[in-house]
Structure formats: C-alpha cells, structure tokens
C-alpha cells in the first residue's frame, strides 16, 4: 500500500517500473504484484494498442481489396474503350495488392514476384487517367514522374530517387504508406537507347536512366532526404523500400508499329520459307497488341529494363465515336464539367449533337486524342465564359457545329425566351 506522501508501507519512495518516474512526478501510480505503472505509461499503452487495432481493421474490413471485375467497373466509369487494357490492369493490380496482403508469400511459402506494368498507346488514349483512377480507387499514394527530366546520378537533372521523394510528399512523409503506393512514369519511350549499338559515349538521359531505374522498379531501399531537402553527407536520410510499390510506365512509342510490322512480315530464305504478304490494313491498335520484348529492345529499351515490366497493356487509338463518348459519358466528362461551371452562374449549357461530332473531328485532325478535347472547348467557350457572368437574364447557352468550326458565336437564350444574337468576341 502507498500513503499520502507517495511512499509505501515501509516508507520507501515508489517508482514506475516502466518509465522510472517517482510517484511525485506523475498523477497516479497503480500497484501490481511487485510492480508499479504510472498513468502516463497506461496512456502510452492505450495509444499503441489503438493504432495496432486500427491497422488490423483497415487491412481486413475497412479496406477490402476489390475484385478484378470491380476494378474494371470503376475504370469503366472514367475511361471509355480500352477494354483489354482495363482487364490487364485490373488483374495485375489485384494480384499485386493480394501479394502485399499475404506478405509476399503463398500458403506453401512460394515467394510471389512483383509485376510492374508497361502501358503502350498513342497520346491522349488514357494511360495517365487509368493509373490515376486505380490509385484513387485503392486509396493509395500516387505520383506521376516525367522520364524526360531524369538523368543518371551526378548529372544535371533529376535523380531517379526524386520520384520516391514526390511520392513521400503526397502522403506527408509517411514511409509505410508510401511503400504501398503507385508510381506512374510517363514518357518512358523517350529514354530509349539512341541506337542499337552500345556507344562509348555516355547516354545520361537514355540508357543511363534505364540502368538507374532498374533497381528502383525491381525493389531497393532508397535513401531520400527528409522533407524535400537537398542531399549532403552529414544529413540523415529516410529509408524507403520500393519492393512493394507498383510501378506503371507509360509511353506513346511512336514508330513501334513499324518495328512490329517489320518483324511480322520478315520472311525466311529458301524453298521451305514461309511467304508473308504485307498487311497494311491493320491499324495501330491491332499492331501494338502483337508487341514482343524483342520489338521493345529494337526500339531502344534494354532487356533488363523490359524484364522488370512483365505486364504489357496496349491501348488503341481513339476513334471519333469514342471521343464523343468521352465528351459526354464518364462521371467527370468534359461537357458535364463545363455545364457545372455555367450552372454556378445560373445558366444552362447545351451542346448539340453536331457540336460534339465537330469537337471529336477537330481532335482527330490534330491527333491529340482525348487530351486535346479540353483545349478545343476552352477556345470555343472563352468569350462566353468571359461575358456571361456580367450579363443579366441569360438562361441558356447553346453550342452547335458552326460554333465549333469558328463560323459563328454561341447562341444565347434569355429568360424572356428571346434568342440573342451571338456573343460578340472581344
């Protein structure tokens, strides 16, 4: 027993068996069989238990891993077309995070390897959007890196470890969260080797970057300066293990179709050689589906780098019909976004069918894919968005094909049902 002076029955001062503080330094000291614990240590134990319970529940109930068909259904809400690519991604991502849940091993202690992903498709076909949607759905940290800015360590440019630093920034430098994140490296085709033959000159932004990315993608412990500081010898670094990060590399790979066509049309020599006729009817998407590792090597990626990206998903060039769907159908479709902006002004925005066709046709001519749709709409709606907030009684803005082609201005309809002349450009 303890008395009011903080001493035991024998008059000795009592101390917490865990932190060593005396009873005078804490509010309460709880006695057990030959041990004591203070209120501060009890609070600390409660915090530790609470954190562990939260982690356990988030692993099981709170964050159930969606099945491949559920992942694809979510991708369908945001990305039009690209059915095969969405299936490939759904299965690869499901298997990756299933591997993490199992601790990297199967029931019979078989070690499960990591399957990073290579996305090949034309500009504006949805590569970046697919990666962003996956990360948002799985609620994991996500960052985009541009391969064209990367150089080997020691040269002017970004080190590959800067990619991990960006990911850490996205999750407030929570290393555990970052180690389960997704990294999307765009323009990966721009770091292809400049020629098939190894050169004696240093290729610091091509093959050199591929070599630097090898370990990072496969899995290594990267040393990252805390809070985005610059590296210097006396500094303490954050140690980040990339073994459980999912790396998705994407690129347009312009000219890869020619490499595939050359390989597929190459015939043998002699009487028994198979004669292959030239097939010029296959479009870009059909050709890219047949891509083989040897085609990527010929394009300029080193074999070791290709080996770290075992899952290859190819995206098709978007048709005019697909671009029209992209304008109207996804949850965050562009026409819905601009309609919402006008709605905030109390004005309805109406796109006629012929306007949607004209927008899609313009994007096809520019060869910018879905990425070019927003710039077309911004250009068309600029004067209207500038003037309408200052105008009174405007109820509706109508966009038709002549408006998109620049032949006329958007039609304004007022609350008293009068049709305005068109918006006058400044």
From Swiss-Prot:
<feature type="binding site">
    <location>
        <position position="38"/>
    </location>
    <ligand>
        <name>Zn(2+)</name>
    </ligand>
</feature>
<keyword id="KW-0547">Nucleotide-binding</keyword>
<feature type="domain" description="ClpX-type ZB">
    <location>
        <begin position="4"/>
        <end position="57"/>
    </location>
</feature>
<keyword id="KW-0143">Chaperone</keyword>
<dbReference type="GO" id="GO:0051603">
    <property type="term" value="P:proteolysis involved in protein catabolic process"/>
</dbReference>
<comment type="similarity">
    <text>Belongs to the ClpX chaperone family.</text>
</comment>
<feature type="binding site">
    <location>
        <begin position="122"/>
        <end position="129"/>
    </location>
    <ligand>
        <name>ATP</name>
    </ligand>
</feature>
<keyword id="KW-0479">Metal-binding</keyword>
<dbReference type="GO" id="GO:0009376">
    <property type="term" value="C:HslUV protease complex"/>
</dbReference>
<dbReference type="GO" id="GO:0140662">
    <property type="term" value="F:ATP-dependent protein folding chaperone"/>
</dbReference>
<dbReference type="InterPro" id="IPR046425">
    <property type="entry name" value="ClpX_bact"/>
</dbReference>
<dbReference type="InterPro" id="IPR003593">
    <property type="entry name" value="AAA+_ATPase"/>
</dbReference>
<dbReference type="Pfam" id="PF10431">
    <property type="entry name" value="ClpB_D2-small"/>
</dbReference>
<dbReference type="InterPro" id="IPR027417">
    <property type="entry name" value="P-loop_NTPase"/>
</dbReference>
<feature type="binding site">
    <location>
        <position position="41"/>
    </location>
    <ligand>
        <name>Zn(2+)</name>
    </ligand>
</feature>
<keyword id="KW-0862">Zinc</keyword>
<dbReference type="InterPro" id="IPR038366">
    <property type="entry name" value="Znf_CppX_C4_sf"/>
</dbReference>
<dbReference type="GO" id="GO:0051082">
    <property type="term" value="F:unfolded protein binding"/>
</dbReference>
<dbReference type="Pfam" id="PF06689">
    <property type="entry name" value="zf-C4_ClpX"/>
</dbReference>
<keyword id="KW-0067">ATP-binding</keyword>
<dbReference type="Pfam" id="PF07724">
    <property type="entry name" value="AAA_2"/>
</dbReference>
<dbReference type="InterPro" id="IPR019489">
    <property type="entry name" value="Clp_ATPase_C"/>
</dbReference>
<dbReference type="InterPro" id="IPR010603">
    <property type="entry name" value="Znf_CppX_C4"/>
</dbReference>
<protein>
    <recommendedName>
        <fullName>ATP-dependent Clp protease ATP-binding subunit ClpX</fullName>
    </recommendedName>
</protein>
<dbReference type="InterPro" id="IPR050052">
    <property type="entry name" value="ATP-dep_Clp_protease_ClpX"/>
</dbReference>
<feature type="binding site">
    <location>
        <position position="19"/>
    </location>
    <ligand>
        <name>Zn(2+)</name>
    </ligand>
</feature>
<dbReference type="InterPro" id="IPR004487">
    <property type="entry name" value="Clp_protease_ATP-bd_su_ClpX"/>
</dbReference>
<dbReference type="GO" id="GO:0008270">
    <property type="term" value="F:zinc ion binding"/>
</dbReference>
<dbReference type="GO" id="GO:0005524">
    <property type="term" value="F:ATP binding"/>
</dbReference>
<comment type="function">
    <text>ATP-dependent specificity component of the Clp protease. It directs the protease to specific substrates. Can perform chaperone functions in the absence of ClpP.</text>
</comment>
<dbReference type="GO" id="GO:0016887">
    <property type="term" value="F:ATP hydrolysis activity"/>
</dbReference>
<dbReference type="GO" id="GO:0051301">
    <property type="term" value="P:cell division"/>
</dbReference>
<comment type="subunit">
    <text>Component of the ClpX-ClpP complex. Forms a hexameric ring that, in the presence of ATP, binds to fourteen ClpP subunits assembled into a disk-like structure with a central cavity, resembling the structure of eukaryotic proteasomes.</text>
</comment>
<dbReference type="GO" id="GO:0046983">
    <property type="term" value="F:protein dimerization activity"/>
</dbReference>
<feature type="binding site">
    <location>
        <position position="16"/>
    </location>
    <ligand>
        <name>Zn(2+)</name>
    </ligand>
</feature>
<dbReference type="InterPro" id="IPR003959">
    <property type="entry name" value="ATPase_AAA_core"/>
</dbReference>
């Amino acid at each position: 027993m303890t008395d009011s002076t903080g001493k035991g029955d024998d008059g000795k001062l009592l101390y917490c068996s865990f932190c060593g503080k005396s009873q005078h330094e804490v509010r309460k000291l709880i006695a057990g069989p030959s041990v004591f614990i203070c209120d501060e240590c009890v609070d600390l134990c409660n915090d530790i238990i609470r954190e562990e319970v939260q982690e356990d529940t988030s692993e099981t109930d709170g964050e159930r891993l969606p099945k491949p068909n559920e992942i694809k259904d979510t991708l369908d809400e945001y990305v039009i077309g690209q059915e095969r690519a969405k299936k490939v991604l759904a299965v690869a991502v499901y298997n990756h995070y299933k591997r993490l849940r199992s601790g990297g091993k199967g029931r019979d202690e078989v070690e499960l390897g990591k399957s990073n992903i290579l996305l090949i498709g034309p500009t504006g076909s949805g590569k970046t959007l697919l990666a962003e949607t996956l990360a948002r759905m799985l609620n994991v940290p996500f960052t985009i890196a541009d391969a064209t800015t990367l150089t080997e360590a020691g040269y002017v440019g970004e080190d590959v470890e800067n990619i991990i630093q960006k990911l850490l920034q996205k999750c407030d430098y929570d290393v555990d969260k970052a180690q389960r994140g997704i990294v999307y490296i765009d323009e990966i085709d721009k770091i292809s080797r400049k020629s098939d033959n190894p050169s004696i000159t240093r290729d610091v932004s091509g093959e050199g970057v591929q070599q630097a990315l090898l370990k990072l993608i496969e899995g290594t412990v990267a040393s990252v300066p805390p809070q985005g500081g610059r590296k210097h010898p006396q500094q303490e670094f954050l140690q980040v293990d990339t073994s459980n990060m999912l790396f998705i590399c994407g690129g347009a790979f312009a000219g890869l179709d020619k490499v595939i066509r050359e390989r597929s049309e190459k015939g043998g020599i002699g009487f028994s050689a198979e004669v292959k006729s030239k097939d010029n009817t296959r479009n870009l998407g059909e050709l890219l589906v047949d891509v083989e590792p040897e085609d990527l090597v010929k394009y300029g990626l080193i074999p070791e780098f290709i080996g770290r990206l075992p899952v290859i998903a190819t995206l098709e060039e978007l048709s005019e019909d697909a671009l029209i769907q992209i304008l109207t159908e996804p949850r965050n479709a562009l026409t819905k976004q601009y309609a919402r902006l006008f709605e905030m002004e109390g004005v309805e925005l109406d796109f006629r069918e012929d306007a949607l066709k004209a927008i899609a046709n313009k994007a096809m001519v520019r060869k910018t894919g879905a990425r070019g749709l927003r710039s077309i709409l911004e250009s068309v709606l600029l004067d209207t968005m500038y003037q309408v907030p200052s105008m009174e009684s405007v109820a509706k803005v109508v966009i038709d094909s002549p408006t998109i082609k620049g032949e006329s201005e958007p039609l304004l309809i007022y609350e008293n049902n009068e049709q305005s002349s068109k918006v006058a450009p400044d």
